[in-house]
């Protein structure tokens, strides 16, 4: 196909090269000028001929014989000019035909040119996209290489940190064991001394108790020895004070033992934490506070977005429920209107309808006929119907616009949810980096001047890659504060966007409610207008105009709607005129066309029936052809 198209293009180009198109245009211009001149001369000649023929007809027969030759010459010259015009036109036509008659149609060539231009544009766009993709691929490859290098360095630093941590843990274990053994020895010596003192004090207490008993016995026997008793009582008081002092010393020793035990426990559990410096503790506290702030902000953003989504969903559900309820009410009212019928009321309304009359707007038109009033009423109803149709169209357009706005707002909400998820992922990555920083601070404290710590490599990168030096503690704090500021700005932006979205959704919901109420009013007015139009048409056909006026027409119209009764009457009259077969068909059609589901099922049944008939006819035709084939042979 490509070879054939190239051959056609070559033929077209060669034929249009050999066609002398510019020369043909020039010749055509010259021929057009000559034709215009000939047309002018021919018009002048015709005018002369017409004038002379009129004069010739007016002259008598004797003069006509003398002027006949002049007229014949004029006619001959006119015929010669016409022949010249025809010959010149034929010559120009044949020249154009000879040059362009065999030339093929240039339309495919133009299409090919347009397609070529389109393909060239597409190729240029694809080239640009290719260059952009190549640039992005190169950037991604560079990033992957950098990530691989960083991972390798991280693995190296992890291995070094683990080895140094193991060494330091072994050293601290040995030191703790030594200190613990020394303290145990001290505690044992102290316990032995305390036990000996306690034994001495208990023995003294027993001796004092025995001496006090003896003293009591002697006091009961010898009342005269008062001075000795006083001396002994003083001694007893001194011994008791010594006992109190000994008890206090015992309590103090027990408290010191408990404190020493707690210190040993703290030394066992916190031997590895003694090496942490105050700066590292400050950094740990800063990272903990930063993580807590970020987590609280994230939770607040999540709760706000969740509440907003819940409000949106609730509003949408309420609107859907209201629409469903309105549809149900409408269907119920339609069913009731179709089913409701009462013979007595219809009979009474028929008797009144024969004499009913539309009340005029002015009191001066009381003597006018009913037909003129009906015509006026018809004009008013037609104008109202046109206005209501225009308002209905405007309301439907507004509803479509509001639905589009609601869908656009839902899309915005989904986009914000995706952005929040990305933020959560970024915060999780920040938490992971903080944990890595906390676990590797021991290595950073004793690192050499020529090596990077793991935290500095994570926060700032490799100096060979980014042409920078080892980051200090201030750089870590600055990066953390920058991350917090960025996240706060994003949070404020999302809150503002959420507030605007909530306001827009509430405004859209209010507009939708107003439009739905207006639509319901328009539908009601449309039904009333339709009933009035039907009643007017029937009244003009079946009732002759009369001058009788009924005074109770206005009161009756206020109490009873004659249009609904007329519609029922008309339906019953048409149904009574039907035959049995027509009634069956009418009932079937009414059941089939009652709802969308029945209509769809009936339509599908018709399609399947037609397809079945087509298949049967095709099979019969094929069978007939196969039956007639041996007869032909």
Curated annotation (Swiss-Prot):
Keywords on record = Coiled coil, Golgi apparatus, Membrane, Transmembrane, Transmembrane helix, Transport
Report any Pfam family annotated for this entry: CUX1_N
Task: Kindly give the membrane topology term recorded for this protein.
Answer: Single-pass type IV membrane protein
Name the UniProt record assigns to this protein? Protein CASP
What residue intervals traverse the membrane?
602-622
Q: Which family does it belong to?
A: Belongs to the CASP family.
Look up and give the organism this protein is from: Schizosaccharomyces pombe (strain 972 / ATCC 24843) (Fission yeast)
| Cell division in keyword set | no
Q: Which residues form a coiled coil?
A: 111-339, 369-433
Q: Main localisation, per the record?
A: Golgi
One GO cellular component term of this record is: Golgi membrane
Q: Which ranges of this chain reside in the Cytoplasmic compartment per its record? A: 1-601
Example GO BP: intra-Golgi vesicle-mediated transport
- Topological domains on the Lumenal side lie at 623-633
Where, per UniProt, does this protein localize? Golgi apparatus membrane
Function, as annotated: May be involved in intra-Golgi transport.
Q: What InterPro entries does this protein map onto? A: CASP_C
């Amino acid at each position: 196909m490509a070879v054939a198209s190239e051959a056609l293009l070559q033929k077209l180009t060669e034929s249009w090269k050999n066609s002398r198109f510019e020369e043909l245009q020039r010749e055509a211009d010259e021929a057009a000028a000559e034709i215009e001149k000939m047309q002018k001369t021919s018009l002048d000649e015709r005018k002369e001929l017409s004038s002379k023929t009129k004069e010739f007809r007016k002259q008598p027969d004797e003069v006509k014989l003398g002027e006949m030759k002049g007229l014949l010459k004029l006619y001959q010259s006119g015929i010669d000019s016409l022949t010249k015009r025809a010959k010149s036109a034929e010559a120009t036509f044949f020249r154009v035909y000879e040059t362009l008659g065999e030339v093929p149609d240039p339309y495919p060539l133009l299409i090919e040119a347009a397609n070529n231009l389109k393909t060239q544009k597409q190729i240029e766009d694809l080239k640009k996209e290719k260059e952009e993709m190549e640039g992005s691929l190169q950037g991604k490859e560079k990033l992957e290489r950098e990530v691989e290098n960083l991972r390798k360095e991280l693995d190296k630093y992890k291995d070094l940190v683990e080895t140094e941590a193991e060494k330091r843990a072994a050293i601290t274990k040995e030191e703790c064991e030594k200190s613990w053994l020394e303290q145990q020895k001290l505690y044992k010596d102290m316990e032995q001394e305390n036990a000996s003192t306690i034994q001495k004090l208990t023995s003294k207490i027993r001796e004092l108790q025995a001496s006090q008993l003896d003293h009591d016995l002697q006091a009961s026997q010898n009342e005269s020895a008062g001075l000795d008793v006083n001396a002994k009582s003083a001694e007893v008081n001194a011994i008791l004070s010594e006992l109190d002092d000994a008890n206090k010393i015992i309590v103090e020793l027990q408290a010191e033992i408990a404190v020493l035990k707690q210190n040993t426990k703290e030394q066992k559990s916190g031997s590895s934490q003694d090496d942490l410096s105050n700066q590292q503790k400050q950094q740990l506290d800063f990272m903990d506070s930063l993580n807590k702030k970020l987590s609280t902000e994230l939770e607040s953003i999540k709760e706000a977005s969740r509440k907003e989504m819940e409000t949106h969903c609730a509003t949408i559900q309420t609107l859907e429920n209201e629409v469903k309820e309105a549809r149900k009410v409408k269907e119920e009212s339609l069913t009731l209107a179709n089913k409701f019928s009462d013979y007595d009321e219809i009979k009474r309304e028929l008797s009144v309808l024969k004499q009913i009359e539309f009340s005029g707007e002015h009191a001066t038109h009381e003597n006018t006929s009913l037909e003129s009033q009906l015509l006026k009423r018809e004009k008013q109803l037609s104008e109202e119907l046109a206005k209501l149709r225009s308002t209905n169209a405007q309301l439907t357009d507004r509803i479509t616009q509001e639905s589009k706005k609601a869908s656009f707002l839902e899309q915005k909400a989904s986009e914000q949810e995706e952005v929040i998820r990305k933020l959560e992922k970024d915060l999780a990555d920040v938490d992971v980096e903080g944990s890595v920083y906390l676990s590797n601070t021991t290595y950073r404290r004793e690192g050499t001047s020529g090596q990077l710590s793991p935290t500095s490599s994570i926060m700032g990168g490799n100096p060979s890659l980014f042409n920078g030096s080892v980051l200090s503690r201030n750089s870590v704090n600055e990066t953390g504060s920058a991350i917090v500021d960025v996240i706060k700005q994003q949070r404020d932006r999302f809150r503002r966007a959420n507030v605007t979205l909530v306001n827009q959704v509430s405004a859209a919901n209010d507009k939708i409610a107003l439009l739905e109420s207006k639509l319901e009013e328009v539908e009601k007015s449309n039904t009333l207008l339709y009933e009035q139009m039907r009643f007017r048409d029937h009244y003009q056909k079946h009732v002759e105009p009369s001058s009788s006026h009924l005074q109770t027409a206005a009161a009756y119209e206020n109490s009873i709607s004659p249009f609904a009764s007329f519609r029922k009457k008309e339906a019953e009259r048409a149904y009574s005129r039907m035959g049995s077969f027509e009634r069956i068909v009418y009932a079937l059609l009414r059941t089939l066309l009652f709802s969308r589901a029945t209509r769809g099922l009936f339509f599908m049944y018709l399609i399947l029936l037609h397809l079945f008939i087509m298949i049967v006819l095709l099979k019969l035709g094929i069978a007939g052809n196969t039956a007639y084939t041996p007869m032909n042979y």
